[in-house]
Amino acid sequence: MAVQQNKKSPSKRGMHRAHDFLTAPATAVEATTGEAHLRHHISPNGYYRGRKVVKTKND
């Protein structure tokens, strides 16, 4: 089992963890319906880039 040679200081520990945070997913707003959706995904109404691409129950 690996054991550290020297104790890591709080500063170095913080520097090591500096990039461990989560980023919020990028969302886009559909031009026709105004709904927010993940980029490069269709909106809940079945629209992608202003065009209807999937049939939904309401159609």
Curated annotation (Swiss-Prot):
Signal peptide feature range: none
Basic residues bias locations: 49-59
GO biological process: translation
Disordered: annotated segments: 35-59
Keywords, alphabetical: Ribonucleoprotein, Ribosomal protein
Keyword Ribonucleoprotein on entry: yes
UniProt-recorded Gene Ontology molecular function terms: structural constituent of ribosome
A Gene Ontology term for the protein's cellular component: large ribosomal subunit
Pfam families: Ribosomal_L32p
Xref: HAMAP family: Ribosomal_bL32
Family recorded in the similarity comment: Belongs to the bacterial ribosomal protein bL32 family.
Name of protein: Large ribosomal subunit protein bL32
Source organism per UniProt: Polynucleobacter asymbioticus (strain DSM 18221 / CIP 109841 / QLW-P1DMWA-1) (Polynucleobacter necessarius subsp. asymbioticus)
